[in-house]
Amino acid sequence: MKLYKICNKISLLLHVLASAAGYFVMEAICRHSFIEAWNYMTQRPLVFAYNAAFIFTSSLIVYLFHRRVFWRVLVTLFWLILAIINGVLLLNRVTPFTGPDLHLITDAMKIANKYLPVAGVVAVCILFGILVILLLMLLIKGPKYQKKIKYRYNIPLILLAVALFAGSTQLALEKRVLSNYFGNIAFAYEDYGYPYCLATTIFNTGISCPRDYSEKEIKRIEKTEKNLPETQEEKRPNILFLQLESFFDPTLVNYLDISEDPIPTFRKLMKEYSSGYYKVPSVGAGTANTEFESITGMSMHYFGPGEYPYKSILRETTCESAPYVLKNLGYTTHAVHNNEANFYGRRSIFPNLGFDTFTSEEYMARENEKNPNGWVKDEVLTDEILKCLDSTEGPDYVYTISVQGHGAYPDEQILEDPEITVSGAPTEEENNKWEYYVNEIHEMDNFVKELTDKLADYPEDVVLVMYGDHLPTMGLTVEDLKNKYLFQTEYVMWDNFGLKKKNENLAAYQMAAEV
């Protein structure tokens, strides 16, 4: 009892120490290393102190309740669970846990069985249930602060602490101890700490109004557009975009030894048609953002860190895009995806992007043709693309999103007689993942050949842009790649009417205008 009284007297000091210790544990979990957490703390002490102060400020809520032990445990669990979520995610992908991921919970639940065994999902549910029961018991039976709570002092002091923390945030931004622009979100989390970065991705969303935005400025811009040459009324080709899931050239990985070229068709097309590197906004995940840039011509740099427009602003409003522009030129616009219509909310998002039709796996005759991982094979897309082209007499814009190359990739040998063998990965498990992945993209490459062969004989002019949406979820680093860049794949612009070849590296948001 005497110890309890002493702890109450120095509780603020204990909160400070506990916040610092707790934050250190959080970073150790997120970085998968106590040594890395120690290096971060000693090399960036001001950032560490700021994030510890963040946790300390959030813990001050306990002084408004008698059940202080319960609230301390609850706050601790809140931060600890967030750290565990991030730590687990970083075992499976390169990008850390962000605010927009909270909007993807329903999508995550749908594909959880592809990343976790059923027993794992059940175990998580059981542990969560036990935790809730223990918290309820602590709330009802736990220790209780016996003295009267002085709200007239506690509330103003807590508000003062929040105000001081807000002021320190602004000061840290001005002094560049922190930054609210994340060029690479994975590196930002390492540099600025998990609590700050997570909060930034939750609250810093959308596009800020430009400083010089006004009616006068818009009229000035309109005047500069009046002397542009009129659009020529000539024959317009069909425009096809094919976004290949996690597709890239695995021979760019330094340590892999691959028995044969897994993407001979794509490589041949790159030599014969316009091609180059394709800069994308994400790595290991984030298909929808590469898709957004390619469709709208807008860079994700203008949005909040880690934001998914598909899960934010596009739920509420329309957006200028290639489909809308092309519809004004007489095109009919189609979207095709061999996965569920609701994944990333596409069923409700695509109308806001200007698509006239959307064909998802539920409406495909061959939806049961799946790979060992449970994803619909890409070869089913050939017929669906041709159906879109045949459905109208005029020109068509068809944006197709493939899914076959999606993770997670099995770390066990599940291909009995793989067409292509892989060696050189650091562990047997990683080698199994790469071998599975390489054989999947080889099948995707065969699909590319089938599609281009069919389109070569199509009676109308066709331009087909093909590219990977991001690198696969393999934990790749810059040092692992010959091209030394994680945020790029490759593209090829194929056609059946003799366009001049042009080699150029492009960003995803530039491609629609380039076509």
Q: What residue spans do the PLM features occupy?
A:
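Short secondary-structure junctions and interdomain/linker hinges
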Residues: R68, V88, Y115-A119, C209, ...
